[in-house]
Amino acid sequence: MSGLEPTPEQFAALAARPADAPVVMVNLLKFHPESGLQRYQQYGRDVAPHLERVGATVRYAGGAPSVVIGEGERPWWDAILIVEYPSPQAFIDMVTNQEYLEVHEHRAAALDRGDLISTSSWSIAPE
């Protein structure tokens, strides 16, 4: 089962990434059965100014109703949220800000499970 907070090792690995490269965070979200979605939507509204403050952009947010390739009819997660930050430090600055930590309580209360995957982009265009 996934934790809802990063381990010190996970946080250190993110901080060690190239400082001048954007980082795209893929959130796989499993909501608590009772009011989890509504609480997460409240978190989304409350976190928007914090994302703006660090220059982050929501690239995609949506449900995960079915599996096309893979096992089972549905994935384990209910929704996907993809957010691009201008750098790893921008993400770190946001999540360590005291005002953000107050908003973060809504996220923790909404989720039964939440995997956060830090990715880097690469081109698939032909050379």
Predicted regions mapped to residue ranges:
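Hydrophobic alpha-helical segments of small multi-pass membrane proteins
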Residues: 80-83, 99
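Secondary-structure boundary/capping signal
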Residues: 55-58, 99, 115
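Short S/T/G/P-rich N-terminal loop/turn motif that feeds into the first structured element of a domain
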Residues: 1-79, 86-93, 120-127
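Short amphipathic alpha-helices in soluble, non-transmembrane regions
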Residues: 93-99
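Charge-dense polyanion-binding interfaces
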Residues: 105-127
